[in-house]
Amino acid sequence: METVQLRNPPRRQLKKLDEDSLTKQPEEVFDVLEKLGEGSYGSVYKAIHKETGQIVAIKQVPVESDLQEIIKEISIMQQCDSPHVVKYYGSYFKNTDLWIVMEYCGAGSVSDIIRLRNKTLTEDEIATILQSTLKGLEYLHFMRKIHRDIKAGNILLNTEGHAKLADFGVAGQLTDTMAKRNTVIGTPFWMAPEVIQEIGYNCVADIWSLGITAIEMAEGKPPYADIHPMRAIFMIPTNPPPTFRKPELWSDNFTDFVRQCLVKSPDQRATATQLLQHPFVKSAKGVSILRDLINEAMDVKLKRQEAQQREVDQDDEENSEEDELDSGTMVRAVGDEMGTVRVASTMSDGANTMIEHDDTLPSQLGTMVINADDEEEEGTMKRRDETMQPAKPSFLEYFEQKEKENQINSFGKSVPGPLKNSSDWKVPQDGDYEFLKSWTVEDLQKRLLALDPMMEQEIEEIRQKYQSKRQPILDAIEAKKRRQQNF
């Protein structure tokens, strides 16, 4: 008798959460696996959809965040249906959090891959990524949407090598009544000149950012990354368009592609549709050429996670041993105090007590953080606070955030006498800096660090003075245009 083997029917692919799933608690529909990182306005987790077995990404957003911006992001994602844009599946309210369920891209962002491998991309790899990215931008721009934050950190790759646009926390919708925007939103080094100048911009602002991203993928960082961001804000609109540090290393086609992206006049800048016909993009190879670098990056990430887990396990063991030592009331002393007993202390060395430890634990025990990097500011996703004060340009908030981080990092450090008040030190009129020779290296380094806030203040004063002169001219031009239209 012939036996018939029964095969399990294949699970359907998740396209959108149905009404039944959306009425349940999210834990009934998904199993959360691990934290991936921080996104705009919230944390991002890897999860599995129980019914289909499909892996998804879930952004958990505290409701005290700017709900208007969150709703805008969801609205934009809901309207998009492209293989080159991260898909949106549905949303839940859970306690004080909003859960946004999105497509999962297992390879992470392009910037993550560059960091993990400690290696920049080849022209072939860049061309393949740019081709998919341009298709995503062509789709968005056709839908009258501006991404406004194109960079390697917001281009995600799935494990097959397909690139998708992500992080719509600052994306905008162009309407018939407002053909251009005049708000400064985005990441400073990638911003187009017209965005910085606040003279209004449209979809081709994303093309400038794409050109900067192409340089970032080739060289590991965007132009001006080595200088203070506030200086970059002034240099981008006034300097000629940036290019490669060593142009001779790159082909004519690649150099020309970047040149067409980085045209300062928006009216003369190429569109996404035009750039898809550029020889550099048209000759791009298939996504299979990205699989080696993806596998290499994922191997590095796995090894780092395993190393972090080993550190946690080791710390747990040390903690356990310390607990055993501290469990008794009395501990035998060592050294000169042989034969005496004293109470064991569990306080740290810096606790200003008269009792010393038998064993000193590290001041900060290692904690495992999934997918954490040292360079958080360039990570795949990050929380943006620019909507907290709508009247303030976002790049200024970027600098303020940096200043807060610097203050936190330097908290508690004593400042040498000559550096306590930066205003006490004046630049010598005669240019005689001999007195600096008597300062220690530490004093000199702290003096150097103190110059940055002074420079930011001076630059801001210059910016305000420049704006006060520039605005009346712009107002006069606008008034003349209106009068001409009336005639």
Swiss-Prot record:
Regulation (activators, inhibitors): Inhibited by the C-terminal non-catalytic region. Activated by caspase-cleavage. Full activation also requires homodimerization and autophosphorylation of Thr-183. Activated by RASSF1 which acts by preventing its dephosphorylation.
List of residues that carry Phosphothreonine: 3, 183, 340, 367, 387
Gene Ontology terms: cellular component: cytoplasm; cytosol; nuclear body; nucleus; protein-containing complex
Main location class: cytoplasm
Domain Protein kinase: 30-281
Recorded coiled-coil stretches: 290-310
Binding residues for ATP: 36-44, 59
Family matches, as InterPro entries: Kinase-like_dom_sf, Mst1_2_SARAH_domain, p53_tetramer_sf, Prot_kinase_dom, Protein_kinase_ATP_BS, SARAH_dom, STE20/SPS1-PAK
Enzyme superclass (EC): transferase
Enzyme Commission number(s) of this protein: 2.7.11.1
A GO term for molecular function: ATP binding
Record PTM N-acetylmethionine, positions in chain: 1
UniProt modification remark: Autophosphorylated on serine and threonine residues. Phosphorylation at Thr-387 by PKB/AKT1, leads to inhibition of its: kinase activity, nuclear translocation and autophosphorylation at Thr-183. It also diminishes its cleavage by caspases and its ability to phosphorylate FOXO3.
Catalytic activity from the UniProt record: L-seryl-[protein] + ATP = O-phospho-L-seryl-[protein] + ADP + H(+); L-threonyl-[protein] + ATP = O-phospho-L-threonyl-[protein] + ADP + H(+)
Signal peptide (from-to): none
Family statement: Belongs to the protein kinase superfamily. STE Ser/Thr protein kinase family. STE20 subfamily.
Name of the protein described by the UniProt record: Serine/threonine-protein kinase 4
Organism: Otolemur garnettii
Encoding gene, per UniProt annotation: STK4
